């Protein structure tokens, strides 16, 4: 079963949930504000697909990022810092994160990639 990590009221997460339901994909939703752990992030970052890196998990265009103190923004200079930042401010994480067998398969909403992954 696919795990979808996100925030319920995020429009991108809602769009992803709608697409997955429409395409009969079973998912388990995990709210990153309540249930995201350092174990999740460490496991993901150790097994990322070649087209992803830890920095891509930080949404540097969002309001949460823009409102961060410069000292917090400096955390993105290391994987350990990225994990710390996401755990402190889960809303800074790019969403959704789709995980299969404890490995990230997709980050963000991309219908074309969803069709390839779940065809």
Identify the role of each PLM range:
Residues 8-16, 54, 114-119:
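Unusually extended, aromatic-enriched hydrophobic runs near protein termini
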Residues 1-23, 27-30:
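Local sequence-structure signature of Cys/Sec-based thiol-disulfide redox active-site neighborhoods
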């Amino acid at each position: 079963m696919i795990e979808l990590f996100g925030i319920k009221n995020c429009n991108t997460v809602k769009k992803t949930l709608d697409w997955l339901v429409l395409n009969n994909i079973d998912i388990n939703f995990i709210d990153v504000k309540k249930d995201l752990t350092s174990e999740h992030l460490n496991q993901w970052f150790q097994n990322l697909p070649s087209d992803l890196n830890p920095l891509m998990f930080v949404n540097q265009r969002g309001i949460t990022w823009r409102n961060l103190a410069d000292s917090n923004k400096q955390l993105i200079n290391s994987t350990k810092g990225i994990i710390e930042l996401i755990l402190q401010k889960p809303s800074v994480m790019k969403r959704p994160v789709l995980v299969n067998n404890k490995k990230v398969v997709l980050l963000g909403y991309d219908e074309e990639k969803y069709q390839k992954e779940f065809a």
